UniProtKB/Swiss-Prot annotation:
Major subcellular site: secreted
Record protein name field: Dermonecrotic toxin LhSicTox-alphaIA2biv
GO molecular function (one): metal ion binding
Keyword Cytoplasm annotated: no
Subcellular location: Secreted
Family (UniProt): Belongs to the arthropod phospholipase D family. Class II subfamily.
Top EC class, one word: lyase
Keyword Disulfide bond attached: yes
SUPFAM superfamilies named in the record: PLC-like phosphodiesterases (SSF51695)
A GO term from the CC aspect: extracellular region
């Protein structure tokens, strides 16, 4: 999965997919009442990027739905996974569950079209704080209450705070999650970060006993870092330059080992060599 980083304006969906991304990451900010409000990152953000692009969250969802609904004039068949980077740092811990409920209602209405031929992309809810694990239950309970438990097949989870793997496992246990887990690791492209925790996550994924199904590394903009990440065995690379990742995947060392995921590749099933 080549994951386009910080895709917060609707026009950027096409821009990143056309550069080679089959997945995008979108920031979600919340208002004081835990309503998802804007697709907005703000300052500071990655070096070389504008931090200030935004849409109203519901408008972005409608644009995303168009891009991921077969038959729509804006349909992009390659776009199969969307990571919502939930900026819950602005919320009190006791608002996490409410944020999950509201997120579920917004997605159900504006993205899934109330279960009636909505967008088809898989969704990852990425949460920066382990203490906000109740967001997951708020989300899953709401989809069930609204009569659409089947849409949970399309939803996965990520804790993005670079916490110890064991602590992340405990948070999932509390949230009642087993499966559909992506584990992120990384840092802004302005700084360097080693691969030791990525390797721990890959080992957990491949042990058959861990909680992780897929691993992604962020933010990867250079060819050398891309090669290191692919060598470490990641499933996804988040990048500001999808074309760079696509180029590396076409190099002799990788073109027979890795390929771009398609809609038929489940993002929840661990790939066995």
């Amino acid at each position: 999965w080549i994951m386009g980083h910080m895709v917060n304006a609707i026009y950027q969906i096409d821009e990143f997919v056309n550069l080679g991304a089959n997945s995008i990451e979108t920031d979600v900010s919340f208002d004081d009442n835990a309503n998802p409000e804007y697709t907005y990152h703000g300052i500071p953000c990655d070096c070389g990027r504008s931090c200030l692009k935004w849409e109203n969250y519901n408008d972005f969802l409608k644009g995303l739905r168009s891009a991921t609904t077969p038959g729509n004039s804006k349909y992009q068949s390659k776009l199969i996974l969307v990571v919502f980077d939930l900026k819950t740092g602005s919320l009190y811990d006791n608002q996490a569950s409410e944020a999950g409920k509201k997120l579920a209602k917004n997605l159900l209405k504006h993205y899934w079209n109330n279960g009636n031929n909505g967008g088809r992309a898989y969704i990852v809810l990425s949460i920066p704080d382990l203490n906000h694990y109740p967001l997951i239950k708020g989300f899953t309970d709401t989809l069930k209450q609204e009569g659409h438990p089947e849409l949970l097949e399309k939803v996965g989870y990520d804790f993005s705070g670079n916490d110890a793997i064991g602590d992340v496992a405990k948070a999932y246990k509390k949230a009642g999650v087993s499966g559909h887990v992506w584990q992120s690791d990384g840092i802004t492209n302005c700084l360097l970060r080693g691969l030791s925790r990525v390797k721990d996550a890959v080992a957990n994924r491949d042990s058959g006993k861990g909680y992780i199904n897929k691993v992604y590394y962020w933010t990867v903009d250079k060819r050398a870092t891309t090669r290191d990440a692919l060598d470490a065995g990641v499933d996804g690379v988040m990048t500001n330059y999808p074309d760079v990742i696509a180029d590396v995947m076409n190099e002799a060392a990788y073109k027979n080992k890795v390929r771009l995921a398609t809609y038929e590749d489940s993002p929840w099933v661990t790939f066995r060599k």
